[in-house]
């Protein structure tokens, strides 16, 4: 009930400076919680500023280092007093986001265009009862680098020109997407927003350093990197 989302953003920026590196965009930290407010849109900010117990926190963060860029989004849950684990409904919601990731990356085929992969992945996801948006971009010397695009958050029918490029091997991408999940306990939709660097090569697709499959727990004594 004290720390604000901006406090966290500026702590992260100061930490990056202390390490002698830099961000290539201003980080985002926002909150979803049980409330009667509408799901905020991509071009606006969550109305919540002060982080509370029981919040689902989303962070979008990327650094520049050794001429390359990262672009990552992860989710954390703020444990309530006495809690040791996140609610099952949020655990299940994250799994739906992972399912969209699997459907999408399983469709990576050399020579297929970004638009073809996007539309196939969206259809398969909707057929399985998921409600995704996919907006994945190349990653490398620039945060949004050269190469084929796989949708934009406001262009889910395909992206002219950049989405028409074929997928090539030995390329990297920020696997960026979300899926809406209705939470009966909160009586509202939430977005499971995920983004993680991945590589496509001779052996197919793989995540460069794994992906998030469990919520980060704020208030737990266990360090996330352990």
Model regions and ranges:
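Active-site neighborhoods and metal-handling regions in enzymes and metal-associated proteins
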Residues: 1-226
């Amino acid at each position: 009930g004290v720390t604000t989302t901006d406090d966290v953003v500026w702590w992260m920026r100061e930490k990056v400076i202390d390490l002698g590196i830099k961000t290539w965009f201003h980080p985002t930290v926002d909150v979803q919680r049980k409330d009667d407010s509408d799901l905020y849109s991509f071009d606006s900010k969550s109305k919540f500023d002060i982080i509370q117990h029981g919040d689902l926190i989303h962070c979008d963060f990327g650094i520049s280092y050794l001429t390359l860029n990262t672009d990552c989004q992860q989710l954390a849950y703020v444990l309530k007093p006495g809690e040791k684990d996140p609610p099952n409904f949020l655990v299940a919601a994250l799994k739906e986001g992972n399912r969209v990731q699997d459907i999408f990356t399983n469709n990576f085929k050399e020579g297929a265009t970004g638009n073809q992969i996007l539309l196939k992945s969206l259809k398969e996801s909707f057929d399985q009862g998921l409600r995704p948006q996919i907006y994945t971009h190349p990653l490398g010397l620039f945060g949004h680098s050269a190469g084929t695009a796989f949708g934009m958050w406001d262009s889910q029918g395909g992206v002219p020109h950049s989405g028409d490029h074929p997928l090539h091997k030995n390329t990297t991408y920020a696997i960026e997407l979300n899926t809406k999940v209705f939470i009966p306990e909160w009586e509202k939709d939430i977005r499971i927003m995920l983004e993680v660097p991945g590589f496509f090569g001779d052996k197919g697709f793989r995540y460069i350093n794994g992906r998030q499959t469990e919520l980060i727990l704020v208030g737990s004594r266990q360090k996330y990197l352990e």
